[in-house]
């Protein structure tokens, strides 16, 4: 019997995903109907066509849902069904799911309802809460194909420790979401699933590599999801969909039994964290997970208990703002957001200073070398198993041109020394901000862009990273939405003279009409392992904005 071609395997997988949706929820023309109705925003369109009683559920935050379930106002079954229905439609518009298992989710919801009915108690803080998972988070009996055709039909036997922690506390899993090939790209495209579009504007990219997660959350079809981040993969999709998110430092949240590219590459390790529509949900998730003391099971975790930093919300923290990295200037709405956040903080009595990163180019060069150290051997090898081509966006991010062949151990050690040098330079830069501040103390946190645009057209050559400095330096980052693009205000700067070709490409890409109404998100960054402080800093910023 002939081995099926990669095209056949990919087509069968896509059909399998669609066939996992109940017949009454299959709408093959829904994307066309949405466009013909004049909508580009999937969240708004789904609110229009779905039952009001389901919207009432899916528009709540995770904490609000948990409270309502614990009070008996909603059953786990009704909550799960509402999110499954919305996810089914969102996938058919955005192409954001790679595994769908609604039947299992609804069965689990019924079991939780039975427990609640008998005991009048919830099994844990996530009782009855549907949580979506990035494809790489292992579940028994489910593929973790991470964008490769070769990994289809090879289900996992173990459950990721993080998933087990959530499940034991009452969470319900119902989908796994799309990723780019090898999860090494800032947009979500693979030969396996195709392209994943932006939930708030289907003409644009959802970002990557947690792009399926970002799209699902942005459409309102998830209240909380799990992403991973090695160069911006949690932050970029969260930014493009107006979400909150946490990229933690290494060693705070378990990566055990999470499938990964370049497993064992520890110079710039991937981390795992929550994405949600509420900052309080991010805080709730992180505190609950860290309180589970998973370091007793996962040897890579650091035994650092959760430290309540709520007192910092009343302290006047000192912020440093990074407006540009000196290589690619962010688009006008992002510059406006940075100026406005400074004004808002200063009006509320916070000290804000401007900072710059003089070694940004060296840092980016080092990141690319780390990611390309095997001369793309792993990706080429996995792709060649089925003959599928390496997708172009991954080729740009993981080069086979920098090194002709995988580098030697000695060259890897040299790279390790370069990473250490950059971390030291960054720490010294941070500590030296004390010279600039009125108090003589160094800054508490940095506010920076996440990307130089609020999204981009699918398949665009948009590759410049504002995120990777904080990966190489292992800093926690919190994403928060600050404003939206306003085509009447955020006009193109026709007098701007680009600094280089990459800057010119980014500048030429800007179209205020195309990006109108897109969210403008920023990231707040603290020193390594200061997740609690980072969340408190984000909360302080949001309080200033609200007030």
UniProtKB/Swiss-Prot annotation:
Pfam families registered for this protein in UniProt: Amidase
Active site, UniProt feature: 134 (charge relay system), 209 (charge relay system), 233 (acyl-ester intermediate)
Listed name of the protein: Putative amidase PB8B6.03
Compartmental location: Cytoplasm
Alphabetical keyword list: Cytoplasm, Hydrolase
Record PANTHER family: AMIDASE-RELATED, AMIDASE-RELATED-RELATED
Family, per entry: Belongs to the amidase family.
Organism (species): Schizosaccharomyces pombe (strain 972 / ATCC 24843) (Fission yeast)
UniProt GO molecular function: amidase activity; fatty acid amide hydrolase activity
Known EC number: 3.5.1.4
One GO term of the biological process aspect: fatty acid catabolic process
InterPro entries hit by this protein: Amidase_CS (IPR020556), Amidase_dom (IPR023631), AS_sf (IPR036928)
Cited Gene3D superfamilies: Amidase signature (AS) domain
Keyword Cytoplasm tagged: yes
Assigned GO CC terms: cytosol
Keyword check for Hydrolase: yes
Catalytic activity: a monocarboxylic acid amide + H2O = a monocarboxylate + NH4(+)
């Amino acid at each position: 019997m002939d081995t099926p071609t990669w095209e056949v395997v990919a087509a069968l997988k896509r059909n399998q995903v669609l066939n996992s949706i109940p017949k009454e929820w299959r709408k093959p023309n829904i994307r066309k109907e949405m466009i013909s109705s004049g909508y580009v925003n999937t969240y708004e369109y789904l609110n229009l066509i779905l039952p009001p009683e389901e919207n009432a559920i899916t528009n709540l935050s995770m904490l609000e849902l948990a409270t309502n379930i614990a009070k008996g106002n909603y059953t786990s079954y009704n909550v799960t069904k509402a999110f499954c229905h919305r996810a089914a439609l969102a996938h058919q518009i955005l192409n954001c799911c790679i595994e769908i298992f609604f039947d299992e989710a609804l069965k689990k919801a019924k079991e939780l309802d039975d427990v609640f009915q008998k005991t009048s108690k919830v099994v844990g803080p996530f009782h009855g809460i549907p949580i979506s998972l990035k494809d790489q988070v292992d579940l028994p009996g489910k593929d973790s194909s991470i964008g490769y055709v070769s990994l289809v039909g090879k289900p996992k036997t173990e459950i990721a420790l993080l998933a087990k922690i959530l499940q034991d506390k009452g969470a319900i899993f119902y989908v796994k979401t799309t990723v780019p090939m090898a999860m090494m790209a800032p947009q979500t495209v693979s030969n396996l699933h195709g392209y994943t579009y932006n939930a708030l504007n289907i003409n644009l990219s959802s970002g990557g590599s947690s792009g399926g997660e970002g799209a699902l959350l942005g459409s309102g079809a998830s209240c909380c999801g799990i992403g991973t981040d090695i160069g911006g993969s949690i932050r970029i999709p969260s930014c493009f969909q107006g979400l909150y998110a946490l990229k933690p430092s290494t060693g705070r949240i378990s990566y055990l039994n999470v499938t990964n590219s370049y497993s064992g590459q520890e110079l710039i390790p991937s981390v795992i964290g929550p994405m949600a529509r509420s900052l309080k949900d991010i805080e709730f998730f992180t505190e609950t997970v860290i309180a589970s003391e998973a370091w007793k099971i996962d040897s890579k975790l650091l035994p650092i208990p959760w430290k309540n930093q709520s007192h910092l919300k009343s302290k006047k923290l000192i912020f440093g703002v990074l407006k540009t990295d000196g290589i690619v200037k962010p688009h006008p709405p992002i510059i406006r957001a940075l100026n406005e956040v400074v004004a808002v903080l200063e009006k509320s009595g916070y000290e804000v200073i401007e900072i710059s990163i003089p070694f940004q180019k060296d840092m980016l060069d080092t990141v690319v070398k780390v990611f390309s150290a095997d001369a793309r051997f792993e990706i080429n090898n996995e792709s060649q198993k089925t003959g599928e081509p390496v997708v172009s966006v991954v080729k740009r991010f993981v080069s086979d041109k920098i090194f002709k062949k995988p580098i030697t151990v000695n060259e890897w050690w040299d790279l390790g020394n370069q990473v250490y040098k950059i971390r030291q330079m960054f720490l010294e830069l941070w500590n030296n901000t004390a010279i600039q501040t009125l108090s003589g103390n160094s800054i508490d946190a940095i506010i920076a862009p996440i990307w130089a645009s609020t999204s981009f057209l699918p398949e665009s050559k948009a590759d410049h990273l504002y995120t990777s400095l904080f990966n190489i330096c292992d800093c926690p980052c919190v994403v928060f939405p600050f404003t939206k693009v306003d085509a009447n205000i955020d006009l193109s700067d026709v007098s701007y003279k680009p600094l280089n070709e990459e800057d010119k490409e980014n500048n030429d890409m800007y179209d205020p009409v195309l990006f109108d109404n897109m969210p403008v998100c920023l990231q707040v960054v603290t020193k390594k392992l200061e997740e609690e402080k980072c969340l408190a800093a984000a909360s302080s910023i949001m309080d200033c904005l609200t007030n």
